[in-house]
Amino acid sequence: MTQPTRIYKHSSAGTDWAALLLGAGLGLTLALQLTTVRKSDFTSFYASLASFSRLSALVGTYLAIVGIFLVARIPWVERGVGHDRLVTWHRNLGPWSLYGIGAHVFFIVLSFAGQDSIPLYKELWLSLIHI
């Protein structure tokens, strides 16, 4: 005879802790970027664009890592929040991580094209062949 399946009740405390940890991690990620900013990062429009690009890369990558963590089937996380809620969060978070990483690619290519004073399509081609 098989053992009965355990049913866990998910409290809002687990959700609150998850949101707190997510926010703290994002805050730490942004703080790491902001502590490395130099005055030279804002000397021109294209330098500022490169700084914004790095920021969007950090946020997008952080959200991608959180998305992987959400569906990693970690028992204590599933007991605290619930698998159905974690999958919903993963589904809602996925596009935003891709938008952040895509914005990074777009803005860094635009920044390099402006700094090198070459057309955008040439910089995009140079970026693609040097990967």
Task: Put a short name on every predicted segment.
Residues 7-22:
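N-terminal membrane topogenic signal
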Residues 81-93:
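Membrane-interface segments at loop-to-transmembrane junctions
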Residues 38-47, 115-127:
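Membrane-interface helix termini and inter-helical loops of multi-pass transporters
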Residues 25-39, 70, 105-108:
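Alpha-helical transmembrane segments of multi-pass membrane proteins
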Residues 92-107:
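Hydrophobic alpha-helical membrane-insertion segments
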Residues 129-131:
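Conserved small/polar residues in nucleotide/adenosyl-binding loops
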Residues 57-71, 96-100:
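Hydrophobic cores of alpha-helical transmembrane segments in multi-pass inner/ER membrane proteins
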Residues 68-84:
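Membrane-helix interface/capping segments
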